[in-house]
Regions:
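Flexible phosphate-sensing "switch/lid" loops adjacent to ATP/NTP-binding sites
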Residues: 1-133, 149, 163-182, 189, ...
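Hydrophobic positions on the alpha1 helix immediately C-terminal to the Walker A/P-loop
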Residues: 195
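Rossmann-fold NAD(P)-binding glycine/threonine-rich loop
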Residues: 147-158
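Hydrophobic beta-strand scaffold residues
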Residues: 141-142, 210
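Active-site signature of alpha/beta-hydrolase-fold catalytic machinery across serine-
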Residues: 198
């Protein structure tokens, strides 16, 4: 470029741009996946597998669970959480019918997966109706499944997509400077997330400063730093190297913080 008279920085860069094969726009809309509202008193519905840990590990929550609801079709109504979980927990709850929900007793609805319950009852609009009621009552909603038709600062569901990606580093990765423990399994119902919670509980009790990425949509409720909901009804929409790019980026942030 010097031979062609392009000697200034701007001129050389301009020439590079003209002769480039492909142009990359360096921008990113990355922001941590997190909810903006404060939870003080929450109810959970329904009381299915994904909700059990919220009762077992109440000590990891920064808020109070005040009621547990389910559908009459689940056969759980009238039973206690200790009885169903076959263990004694911090607080035992009598499971109530969602039709008798007491709206004045809580500020946040933690809404679990409802597809199986909807199929069982034939009520395909079950989730929609409950969300509309919660919105009308001014309640926060933390949902495990996507509710794309509903937006607002008091509605949250975890999702990882292209908009979640950090700036492109063209294949370069951060060097991980802290020990990392990974929990892996080959199928469902192996207790992978339960083990994540148990390790969190034990390490915090021993005074360790930890950073954590949870693999269930409820992860942020326990104070985990990031959520990567890759389990049942996964809402992760990135694949291949994008997954490596994303997880390497957030692990690097955790290394710097802890």
């Amino acid at each position: 470029y010097i031979l062609t008279g392009k000697t200034g920085t701007k001129s050389v860069l301009s020439e590079f741009k003209i002769n480039s094969v492909k142009k990359y726009k360096i921008e990113s809309s990355y922001k941590p996946v997190s909810f903006e509202f404060t939870i003080n008193r929450a109810i959970i519905f329904p009381f299915n597998k994904e909700m059990h840990s919220l009762i077992r590990y109440q000590n990891l929550l920064s808020f109070d669970v005040v009621d547990v609801y389910d559908s009459k079709y689940s056969t759980n109504i009238g039973a206690t959480t200790d009885h169903l979980l076959k263990c004694k927990n911090k607080k035992d709850f009598l499971i109530k019918n969602i039709k008798d929900i007491y709206w004045d007793n809580f500020d946040t609805l933690i809404l679990g997966h409802l597809d199986e319950l909807s199929n069982l009852t034939g009520r395909t609009n079950l989730k929609k109706d409950l969300i509309q009621q919660a919105i009308a009552k001014g309640k926060n909603i933390y949902a495990f499944d996507e509710i794309p038709d509903c937006n607002g600062s008091n509605i949250f569901y975890p999702i990882i997509n292209k908009q979640s990606l950090p700036p492109d580093r063209f294949g370069m990765l951060y060097r991980i400077s802290k020990p990392v423990v990974g929990i892996f399994g080959t199928s469902s119902r192996q207790g992978k997330f339960t083990l994540q919670l148990k390790l969190r509980e034990l390490l915090l009790e021993r005074g360790y400063s930890i950073g954590q990425i949870g693999t269930e949509p409820s992860a942020l409720l326990y104070g985990m730093d990031y959520v990567f909901p890759m389990g049942y009804n996964s809402s992760v929409y990135i694949q291949g190297f994008d997954v490596i790019r994303y997880t390497n980026y957030i692990i690097n942030i955790l290394c710097q913080k802890n």
